[in-house]
Structures are given as structure tokens and as C-alpha cells.
Amino acid sequence: MAMHRRTLMKRTGAAAGAAVLGPAFLANTPAALGAQDENTLEFWDTLNADPRQSIVETLAEDFAAENGDLTVEHRGWTLEELQDTLPRVVDSNQGPDVAQVNNGESLMGPMIRAGQLVDISSYVEEYGWAEGLPEGLLARNMYSADGTEFGTGQLWGVSSEAEIVGLYYNRAIFEEVGVEVPTTLDDLEAVFQQLLDAGQTPLVFGNLDGWTAIHLFGNIHGTMTTREYLDGIVYRTGEQSFEDQSIIDAAARLQQWVSNGYLLEGFEGIGADDAAALFEAGSGAMLMQGSWQAGSIGENLGADAAGFFLTPPLEEGGNVLHVGGVGIPYAITTNATDPDLAAALINKLVSEEAFAALVEAGLLPAGEIADDQITPDTLSGDLYSAWNSAVRNDSLGHYLDWAAPGFYDLITSELQRLLGNQVTPEEFAANLQEFYAASFE
């Protein structure tokens, strides 16, 4: 077979360089967008930076080699780009065979109702995709057959990774200032203040992209809410309201963090990637970010120099519903030329081989991590222990933007206003509820 030119792309899609790979794999090739012939399999996701991008592209290259004359093309997008682009291109029959489709009403529900996703029930049984994860995690990729009920019914996508959002910390700064990992939310705020008094930035945070505030607010709210409330609001039972006291109290607490100076100065104009880069360069004591950042932090700050802990509860020993769950699932679009082959690719992306590669990179695969793979007092050890604990204690919450179609844009905008003290906590909650209630009409 002829050699293909592999074009590496930046997140915006502009060319960044080129390298020659194996005979049947293309990565981020701009000309490759759209429906392909029967010998080409295209998949899109949000894996656009190493080590995650390298892992998925190695798996795709192996899959191409295992399937004769097949060409596999991969494109990694930002989440915002993928969510905006995918439904439109599938509707025009120019979409990929396989794509990550964000959970809930953010994207999956609307695409099912629009007839843009393939029913994968037969493949779930064939490949055993429902095995090994608790029902509460599987529910995040489930919808009824008509796409109207979230969290029940059948699987519409499969996740290769798990996700949990917590606090990365710089061990050297903690030791220098004389603080320890906190066990309550009040303790965390006391640590923030000690770090601030010592001239350190307590929490490196950038909200230019908007989505980071969902995580920050969500984890504060997770200390104040219940499973019944959070499942009800996200799975849209119609019995819960955003004008709940827990939402108002969490919003007030977040505003207090801003006024106390706990967040990185100028966070409004700093992107999530830039904030992470600052922390990874040794600037700032903590970074609230998802498990997907662990590989980069381990590589840059150091696997022994960084640690990880989950947002502590209001009272010691209490429960917190942490932002997270399973990673964005891979689904088969109705543009797929060969759904059977598309399903086989997904199976490769969620295989034991993929699981091992993610663990090797210090990332978090979907499923419990075996004790013999956990090294204490390391970044990955902290992360894996925290994840296993959250799974066993049913302590995984949700991403609030899953709650309604278009809710992502609304909640990111309202959180920016909340952080800027442009709305009160009560107004913030009322604005969320007005949009949420309208989504049922």
C-alpha cells in the first residue's frame, strides 16, 4: 500500500507539522472531513494533545493494520468545536463514522432524537461493553430508544476513559508553607488562606473557556447536595429545581472564594490550558482539573512532585458528589458506511490494550484500578485511589451542563456573571431554573 502523509494539527485545525506513519492511518487531516469511501473509517473525538492523542492514534494505526486495505482517519477537536460541528455535518451526510458524543442533553439526547446515531444494542452484547462498570456509571451513556429519557434504557455510546475532577497540588509548596491535604471544606479554605498569606496563589484557575467554572462550582455544590437531587436534575425527572438552597449556597461560597482572593488573579482572561501550564511549571499551589490532565502534570511538574485529592466534605467523614463519571463516549453516527466495522473500531478504543496504555500514561481508564497498579505517594496513586473510593462509595456526581439542550452555553455565561459579581446567588439560581423549566415545554 502507498504511504500516507500524516499532518499534525493544532486545536484550531491549522497545520503544525508533518510526519510519515504506517500505511493506512491519517491524523487530523483537514481534507479528510466528510463522508468517506468504504475503505476509509473516520473518527472524531476530543483527544487532541499528548499523551491521550498518541494513545488513540497508536490504537487506530494498529486497527488499520489489522484490517487489510482499511484507512483510518482521526481528528481531535476541542469539546466546543466538536459539539458545534458534529450534528451539522452528520445532518448533511458529511460526518465521521465514529465520534465522541457528549453525554446527556448536551449532545447525545438531541442527536438520538434527530436520528443521527446508530442503535448499538447488538454490539453491546457482542463485545460485552456493559460488563465491568457499575450501573450508576453505565447510566450516563444510556437513553431510551426514542432519546427522550436520559439515564435509562440502552447504551448509545461507550467510554474508554473515566473522569473525576479534583485538586492537583504541588507537594513542595504544601511542605514549604506547612499545610496538609484538608479533610473538610472549611479546612480547604483555611489552607487557601495560609497559602495566600505565604504569598502563594492558592488555586490556579482560568475561565476564559467557560467550562472550568462548571467544574469548580459543581464540586462546591457536590459538598452540599444529595444523590436524589443531582440525579433528578440531570436525568430530568421533573421533580427538581435549580432554585434549590444547595445551588444558592454553593454560588455564595464560590463568590466568597473570589472575594477572598483564593483564585488566580486575572482568571477571567486565562484559558484552561494556560492555567494548567502555569501549574505544571510550578506556579501556584493547587489546580482544580479533571483526571485527563494527570498525564501532562506528571510529565511536566513530575509524578512525585504533584499529588491529587478530591474536594473534601462539609464535615469530616461526610459524602461529596464529585464532578465526573465516564469520559465522553464513542458512538456510531448514521453516516457510517459500515456500522460493523465502526463498532469494531470502538471495541479497539475501549480494549484491554487501551486500558493498559492509559494506566501506563498515568491516565484514568473506565473501570476500577487493580490495587497492584496503584503506587502510593505518587500522582497516579493518589488519582487511582481517589477514583476507586468514589466508585465504591457511589460518590460520582454529574456535569451540570448535561441537564438540558443548550444548557452548556447558559450555565457557562451565568457562572461568568456570578464570578464577576454581576448576579446574586439567588439571581443565578433563578436564571438557571428559567432556562431549565423551558426545556420541558
What are these regions (language model features)?
Residues 61, 65-66, 91-92, 177, ...:
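Extracytoplasmic/periplasmic substrate-recognition and gating elements
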Residues 146-160, 165, 189-239, 284:
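Extracytoplasmic/periplasmic solute-binding protein
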Residues 192-195, 235-268, 307:
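Glycine-centered hinge/linker elements that transmit conformational signals in sensory
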Residues 2-116, 126, 131, 181, ...:
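Conserved N-terminal structural module of periplasmic/extracytoplasmic solute-binding proteins
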Residues 121-136, 224-249, 299-301, 313-321, ...:
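Short, solvent-exposed loop/beta-turn-alpha elements that line the ligand-binding surface or hinge
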Residues 235-236, 323-324, 361-371, 382-440:
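C-terminal capping/gating helix-and-loop segments adjacent to ligand/active sites or protein-protein/ligand interfaces
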Residues 105-165, 216, 307:
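Hinge/lid segment of periplasmic solute-binding proteins
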Residues 76-85, 185-190, 266-280:
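Short helix-initiation/N-cap motifs at beta->coil->alpha
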